[in-house]
Amino acid sequence: MATIRIHDEKNTLIEHQEEVARFLDEQEVIYEQWNIEKLPSELSEKYDLTEDEKERILAVFDTEIQDISARRGYQSQDVISLSDTTPNLDELLKNFQREHHHTDDEVRFIVSGHGIFVIQGKDGTFFDVRLNPGDLISVPENIRHYFTLQEDRRVVAIRIFVTTEGWVPIYENESVQN
């Protein structure tokens, strides 16, 4: 289940699921929980995935992917896996960690591991969304944000896209202050 930390003077923490869902809804960020128990045990917490294993993960969550795609107009999806065994992990993270926005939604479903989206709220204040297996988030178009890994430095996520072009960032000049 996701938690939120607001970058305010109190570093406000939101941990209860109803409050997390309400806060994200107020920010127009889609948040859902999908049944992670559907994932076969041999794919759980596995970070070196073959293309066949990635396709199996997509097949497991096909109903959910098709549902959100029909509601939001998404056209394609893939699986990304990052861990300390990923070649050039630090270089990849530098790209993800640069503040940016997109002209479409950025959608991620966490299959294994953890991730953090840092998002600019409607009032201009940034907040972290710490995601865990089973969490789906959709950052709306044109919202400044970036993604990073948590301390374990590993994640497997389904990425869902509006277009078949996939992840196309528009980088910002200003950086987020934590």
UniProtKB/Swiss-Prot annotation:
Site positions for May play a role in transmitting local conformational changes: D105
Binding positions for Ni(2+) per the UniProt entry: H100, H102, E106, H145
Enzyme class, first EC level, given as a word: oxidoreductase
InterPro entries assigned to the protein according to its UniProt record, in alphabetical order: ARD (IPR004313), ARD_bac (IPR023956), RmlC-like_jellyroll (IPR014710), RmlC_Cupin_sf (IPR011051)
Reaction(s) the record says it catalyses: 1,2-dihydroxy-5-(methylsulfanyl)pent-1-en-3-one + O2 = 3-(methylsulfanyl)propanoate + CO + formate + 2 H(+); 1,2-dihydroxy-5-(methylsulfanyl)pent-1-en-3-one + O2 = 4-methylsulfanyl-2-oxobutanoate + formate + 2 H(+)
Sites marked May play a role in metal incorporation in vivo: E99
Cofactor (UniProt): Fe(2+); Ni(2+)
Molecular function via GO: acireductone dioxygenase (Ni2+-requiring) activity; acireductone dioxygenase [iron(II)-requiring] activity; iron ion binding; nickel cation binding
Metabolic or biological pathway, per its Swiss-Prot or TrEMBL entry: Amino-acid biosynthesis; L-methionine biosynthesis via salvage pathway; L-methionine from S-methyl-5-thio-alpha-D-ribose 1-phosphate: step 5/6
Site (Important to generate the dianion): R108
EC number(s) per entry: 1.13.11.54, 1.13.11.53
Transmembrane segments: none
Residue numbers binding Fe(2+): H100, H102, E106, H145
Keyword terms of this UniProt record: Amino-acid biosynthesis, Dioxygenase, Iron, Metal-binding, Methionine biosynthesis, Nickel, Oxidoreductase
Cofactor binding summary note: Binds 1 Fe(2+) cation per monomer.
GO biological process, one term: L-methionine salvage from S-adenosylmethionine
One family name in Pfam for this protein: ARD
Subunit comment: Monomer.
Family statement drawn from the similarity comment of this UniProt entry: Belongs to the acireductone dioxygenase (ARD) family.
PANTHER family per the UniProt record, alphabetical: ACIREDUCTONE DIOXYGENASE
Function: Catalyzes 2 different reactions between oxygen and the acireductone 1,2-dihydroxy-3-keto-5-methylthiopentene (DHK-MTPene) depending upon the metal bound in the active site. Fe-containing acireductone dioxygenase (Fe-ARD) produces formate and 2-keto-4-methylthiobutyrate (KMTB), the alpha-ketoacid precursor of methionine in the methionine recycle pathway. Ni-containing acireductone dioxygenase (Ni-ARD) produces methylthiopropionate, carbon monoxide and formate, and does not lie on the methionine recycle pathway.
Protein name, UniProt field: Acireductone dioxygenase
UniProt organism field: Bacillus velezensis (strain DSM 23117 / BGSC 10A6 / LMG 26770 / FZB42)
Classification of source organism: Bacteria, Bacillati, Bacillota, Bacilli, Bacillales
Originating gene: mtnD
